[in-house]
């Protein structure tokens, strides 16, 4: 016993250290209330155990209770535990007796859980070799499947031959379906009821819902013979009643012939979608499917026109419950629909069926091998509200969190799964949960019991003397007072005490609503936010204002609802620093002389000033030039007139000081050119309040006034000199031009050569004119004389 307690002690110390304060703050007054706070909490049932005040101090972490003086054997802390009831070893190799095959371990266990805690257990699964197989062939016999029916006439023999390579114990059966034999799913004229294909013309069987034709058998020839004798039928709409048939094939276990220790394969063959759920309301069928077997003496579905089609959820429940693995063999056009169904149905697979079912054999073999290469767990039973999680550890040893399926397994490989179970709340009932591999009959049964009570609750002293002469019952180290009594030991009477002594004012709540009045005194409640204190529980250390989510800006202490700031901080929220280090600009001036330092930050007061230290100010000018008017007024004024400069200095934000005792290290040296061209120098400093002080104003290097006569004389002489120079230049230019013209004339004259002759310009003083008319008349006279 001592070793167990010592081990328990070290276990307590290591558990949940990060929540050690949560148990004591929960306000638990009984052991059971303490356990409900969390799995890390424990209760001290030791008599006369006190620490500080209040019954709630008995509830804490085991380590804290030990530190408070509670003896280890009085600490109530029930632990979650797993007890394995049945754990047969997994089967290895081929087994002669299929009933002795074990494919999951363990097989049964009990699990005791503390609310809020979790427990992890390991489940192992191994598929045994040469496991028996039952295959039920469920075929759509609507008119469009006529060629498929001819193709599978020898399927039984071929399938048995191929399956014999995989298992030595194989059986197969046959069933068919069309549609609910009711309008609007079929035509209801007498001729078409008798022969739905009369309009083709072709003979068809009357429309039927589901027919179970051949129970599971190992006689392949019998299967072939049954298939050869089948005839097609017909209906109106494209979706068929296949889900009705699946439901009956899954739940009619005895008539189908499903064995308990075999792999149940249901091959669904169709070229159309299937009705489900409330589709049958079109025919006026409103009674939900009950999930029961309704095969009559002829092995036909007798409730086809009475019950609705099953829903997907109902199919999942019955397929899982009866360990049936569904293989959808459908045409290419329907694959996308049935793939969606297969994602919801555990263990279901989908294969593409050729138009004439020519590949059905290969499809079945491939689906079987795929199913045998996968191990997937499913959880059944009372699982609502449980916290369940899985981690798969497949054949390569790699863990896959949040996964309960292993793929690409070989028959004989072992798949392990870590299953974590937790319950969030205390429950007065036990739960029964089943964990099983999909498609296998083996299962792990788990009985989950909540651990919500303490062992000390079994021992109760009614009207105990430990409770003030029998005024209460003593249990788990505390008194449960009888009516009319109160107090830790039931020492106070409710009738004899006034609650007024626990009120700060008559209109206030007792103990400010944050404590209990015991025997005229307030016992303040524990709070997860901090301490509640005061004679009336009126104070606390967590109700002060917050800055950026931090109590008192994390720079002060909360005392009775008000922030008391630490050194270096001020303000209602203690968020305002008194330091001015961040306000000093690079030149050492507080806020560059353009603002005030408030809460450690510069508030720029000069228009246009900005920046962390108001260093940017396009409209401000430099700090020296901004003081020009004040400085020039001070230098030009004498005596009483200097008082007139005070206003100008105020506008410039400065004060002139004659004191020489100041710190020159942080002073700014300024130089300005005055109106009289004198160089003005002065120093600028800043006092503790951020005000600008001007020191050491001096004026030097003033230029002498100009000599006006000398300037005028110089200007006159310069003008005269310029005139003389211009005249000389003009004279030189004229002389140069004349000389050039004379030289040109002399050159032309030297080139001239004169000859004697008549002057072409001379004319004589006389002129001779000849009368042309006179000569013509003389000629006429001569002619007349000759004629005569």
Swiss-Prot record:
The chain crosses the membrane at residues 710-730. Disulfide bonds join 23-41, 31-454, 34-59, 44-70, 197-204, 252-293, 394-406, 426-452, 456-476, 467-479, 481-490, 492-519, 502-517, 511-522, 524-537, 539-560, 544-558, 552-563, 565-574, 576-599, 583-597, 591-602, 604-614, 617-620, 624-670, 630-649, 633-645, 678-702. It comes from Sus scrofa (Pig). Ca(2+) 1 binds at residues 144, 147-148, 271, 355. PANTHER family: INTEGRIN BETA SUBUNIT, INTEGRIN BETA-6. The keyword Kinase does not apply. This is Integrin beta-6. Pfam families: EGF_integrin, I-EGF_1, Integrin_b_cyt, Integrin_B_tail, Integrin_beta, PSI_integrin. Residues 131-371 form the VWFA domain. GO terms for biological process: cell adhesion mediated by integrin; cell migration; cell-cell adhesion; cell-matrix adhesion; integrin-mediated signaling pathway. One of its GO terms (cellular component) is focal adhesion. Mg(2+) binds at residues 140, 142, 144, 240.
